Amino acid sequence: MVFPAGDLASAVTSLPRVRSTLQLDPLTRVLLIPLAFCIWWIPMQPCRASDLRYQLGKRVHRFEAAWEERDSPEARARVLTPLQAAVSAFFSGNQTAAGKAIDQACLALDEAGASPEQQLWHSLNISLATPLIPLGTPELELRVERGYKLPETPEPTGMMEMALLRGEQVCSEGATPWTQLSQTFAVPTADLAEGDYRLRVRLKQGERQFEFPRQMLSVTANPARRLSKLADDEAALPEETPKSFRRTLRDTMKELTGLLGASRPETDYPAHALLEQCESWSSQLARGEAIRLATGPGQYWISPQEDRRAARCRLLWPSKQLPVADQAATDPVKPRPLVIALHGAGGSENMFFDAYGAGKIVRLCEERGWLLLAPRLSPLTGTGLELPGLIAAVDALHPVDRRKVFVVGHSMGAMQGLNLTSRSPEMVKRLAILGGGQRVRQVDAFQQIPLFAGAGAEDFGRGGVQQVARQFRQAGLTLEERDYSQVEHLGIVQVALDDVFRFFEAEETP
């Protein structure tokens, strides 16, 4: 459950310019638009609210990673109630209660139950003053405090061991006794070279050890001055600079500038690498040279733009080579299948990469050598670009196998997946909707597109999925419908993704 990186003002000002809006029935629109204002307001709050958003994302990732390893019918039964509470708290805007419920679900994976000490450890937040520091900063300050209260709170004891890592190499470390529930610690950073590091914090109590979710810390020389210069250079770029290049540069600069301010982003950005990339792009564009927004295997943030319509996206270029049978012998760069993943309300382009099974879809695409694109959605403006524009943006960076473009959407993203596909059915081989849906206005558009419709038996979005499935059955269209027992709205994506990818790979209709 990751929170949006945009703001309400940008969503509203783009309304007259964007065609790719959700086509909702009147009742759904009445329900979603107030929800959109509630959710999009969250990032505009001060630092504490943005840190709560970040901490909630870390809790979800910790739970989903544990659930992926320990999933079973019995485990699903134990986590069902706290997950339902988490979803309810999230949509009511209570991030603290949502985080507590997620931790309860994580602890419930162990059938033996959790001790008061384990409950306390899970309740703790590790908060950085900033995730981006200037080169030569003497030390990094971090704060350990409870994210929420517990009925029973053991006394804080043990040692907090902190280390900054590049890969698994320890570059700086320190240890301090943990004696207070709210306590500030410091890690020496004066001797760190420029780069992007992972902060590892472990609590040791005798033979017991608890490791907190790792966070990123970036060290770079003069970040404020360099970002200010970048802003001036971007404003001076030639008018003929391609819109997608300029928009990607501007959006990335905005994310980096936020790291220096009071807000905490929802995800871990490799800020040093991104800043150097922006400087390289800016220099090339100033000389009138073309740039490549993605140059090889890895993950990228891009902002393709057509006219005044744009989409902030996260892209996976997998490192695995395609099987020989899938490669065209004459192509120097082999076209790859593409999955377009559409998140639910309150999410962003980072949600499928960080959540929904701790980024499970990334692993599934990596294993197959498939490209993955996750655009940011808004209940008010949709994706910004239609499917042809999104596919073309990826194809400009790495050839896309146009015969194998798949779309998967969750909740609001499921509705958007139906809308986008109905407007460009020739672009999509197969479509999957999870935990959401609405009446399809043009069912005939799906004559050649098999649909996977999945919902949890305890999912409040189940009715929408069933409505779409019913339309497909009545029209005699190709459909695979799955209902997952003891699964609710948050867990449906993680639970169903294996079936979704099996469905995508099937050559015969189900």
What are the functions of these language-model segments?
Residues 323, 331-336, 341-381, 461:
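Short substrate-entry loop that stabilizes the transition state in hydrolases
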Residues 50-118, 339, 408, 489:
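Long, contiguous interaction/targeting segments characteristic
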Residues 403-448:
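Primarily recognizes the serine-hydrolase "nucleophile elbow" in alpha/beta-hydrolase
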Residues 454, 460-510:
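C-terminal catalytic histidine-bearing segment of alpha/beta-hydrolase fold enzymes
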Residues 125, 170-184, 190-336, 470:
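A domain-start/cap signature at the N-terminus of enzymes
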Residues 329-334, 382-411:
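Gly/Ser-rich "nucleophile elbow"/oxyanion-hole loop immediately N-terminal to the catalytic nucleophile
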Residues 47-79, 124-131, 135-141, 220-255:
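Amphipathic, heptad-repeat alpha-helical segments
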Residues 106-136:
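Short, compositionally biased P/S/T/A/G/V-rich stretches that sit at domain boundaries
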